[in-house]
Amino acid sequence: MTFHRSQNLREVATKHCYQIQGPDAVRGVGGWDTHVNQGSTSGQLANNLANLGEGLVAYAQALGEEWNNTTVVVLSEFGRTFRENGSRGTDHGHGTVYWVLGGNVRGGRIVGEQVAVNPQSLLQNRDYPVLNNYRNLLGGLLGRTWGLSASQLQNVFPGARPDALQLL
């Protein structure tokens, strides 16, 4: 399921609270391929971030008290280049960020491995490096949230070293 507006996440929250029993779900949000005219404080990227933020707020509000039992992870399968391309956008890159939200998340901080952004740390002088493997993060969060064993997590994320980064 792909979302483009906060109303969609509000509807999902309603279904989550009243129809779904047990752990749920992977949801997608499209429209993030910003090769052309990405913008910064205005434009495609700013609009997408605003819509995502509004959707997440609507989702949390619609869940009400159930938000305290909910963990949301926002991630992308790839990052974007640190440097702008010739079309005023960014191309597919390597490193990215993950957002972890929820009523039981110890947030309000940046966690995981980090490096200063400088020419020496960028791959091909344009890409932020992959420092935090999504398999490790998701494995750690799923293990803590759903009580999955190390062997169960290895079936889903072979070779991963689950680490919830002290977020839960």
Regions from the language model: what does each represent?
Residues 1-168:
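Ligand-binding pockets and gating/stacking loops
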